């Protein structure tokens, strides 16, 4: 049966706590000067114990006191004021998460996560509160892929087992969490003592800074607000006190220092319970509400891990073990060898090749002199004062054999090591003297079982994969927009020039002996400009390519008798291109979410239009009579080239005044017009060459003209899921959309040319703007 602790000293505490914790701890607070000049406290007594476990062992609910944290952050009492804007009626979770989000050390992605996902924010705040108290030090990380020499990995199943594995990581490592909390308390000048906090007006400070101050002055806080032998750190460590009573006491302290006026009435009217009177309070009832004492069995029942959490913890432990076994530790660089003395060189020179090298024969230079006294290597000199000076004979350059790679007799093959070759030999500590050139003669090849070992690269995390994918798509998007802007200016400049004058100028500028089959040629003479004189970035070639593609699609579609062979399966080709595009990304892991493309949205609109047309055709009792037209009715005037409209005139002045310049960075984000790369509308000359404007069209019943679809600006919409109006279109995507539309028109319109639903489907994508306003087909 749980007992409620009395207002006085708890006598039952001596029976339930170890003997060494029955004494009242020393409450001395020292100070030390930090490197930055600030004064920090050194808590010399009653210091909190950090969570410490072996690497890979999970932190279970009892270790982090999950029930206490849950009750603190799930309390919905709206009695707090948010710092610094002063918004009232906030609960504790709101003001604590807001303080974390306002920290200068919080990234933009994490800040958005804290503000949008309340449950993920609470999970992170639970760990931050333990770091805030000092229960977790900065040697913990919570992701098995992380490796550091002074870090240990521990999963937290109660917080991580039920989260999305592909989501942005919700728990940062402990050093990063500590940095976020320090930023929340140090970005702005905050009161750093209890007296300074009391002198401030509401809102006095944020809860992160308040908890740091309370932990720093824990002995004073324990003396003022707790009955002995309880102290401030019992709130997060003492499992034999009920989680509910500890959470109430913690929130009582938060409200007292953040919201109260420190009067007797405020202590009695605390929303988390009236304060209690006791010693050291100055006559005020400022002791926290009494605690509920639990037995060991009752304490264990408060924090029970579920089966799924236990399985998750074991899974992560094994994963961590596998990662540590697969990755070798970072090798230490060998010490730089000392210069070989002469006496050691002479000793090694006398050895036969292949002889095992023992340790140094001479421990010092004096031993070498004594050994050389019996040989001819000792040279004596007479000083001017008559004394005799002895020294060893200096060897000749050829004696060192630095240039020669071998001595007389067979010797093992020398193993050369370079920095580029990340061999295990270079990674392992070198034996003494291994850097000497002569010692290297005796280095044999490494054993076979060491040759294949090399450090494996770490796999990228889901967040790193998403960032890399986003970066690639962003680069492609910007390059496509700049390319489209350049093509727009170049096309406007090309259209303002008379074709005969343009091609005549290009032909005159051809060098003598120009051959289009030469490797250095820039293309067919007279069609493409000389890149040394006029750079068009491939706009002209892209234009002719679009004409050829459109012509080939027209001929393939009009080949009803399959005279040119079997018809191409364009749908299959599009699927293969899409599959190749996805494989080119070369990413491991699943793509987070599916983003609809511009072609799929356009296809949905076309399907809706076709359904409406079918419904209209079914409702119509008699087919609409089509007005016959003859070749005479289609006058040459209508098929001739129209005068330049206002848009071309504007483009003319733009091209004439400014000329073509490489688009700047600011131009990269300008809107792209409909006549960019990939527009394949044919002029009347090309249509006459293809048979679309000749008199043989009179045999085909005329078709009404449908309003053309507006030019859709769409690049590959896998970039951030933008709208169709915010993206660019490539030539391949417009080809896919047009092929799909025209292939479907073959099925619905070619066999029923006079049907009301089949009118005007042939060249709907080739008719544009001013011609549609007049009700007459015209071609730019």
From Swiss-Prot:
Purpose: Probably involved in transcription regulation via its interaction with the INO80 complex, a chromatin-remodeling complex.
InterPro entries: Ies1
Domain of life: Eukaryota
Protein name as catalogued: Ino eighty subunit 1
Compositionally biased region (Basic and acidic residues): 563-584
Family matches, as PANTHER family: INO EIGHTY SUBUNIT 1
Ranges annotated as biased composition (Basic residues): 600-613
Species annotation: Emericella nidulans (strain FGSC A4 / ATCC 38163 / CBS 112.46 / NRRL 194 / M139) (Aspergillus nidulans)
Keyword terms: Nucleus, Transcription, Transcription regulation
Tagged with keyword Transcription: yes
Ranges in coiled-coil conformation: none
Stretches for region Disordered: 1-25, 563-780
UniProt key word ATP-binding: no
Biased composition (Low complexity): 614-635
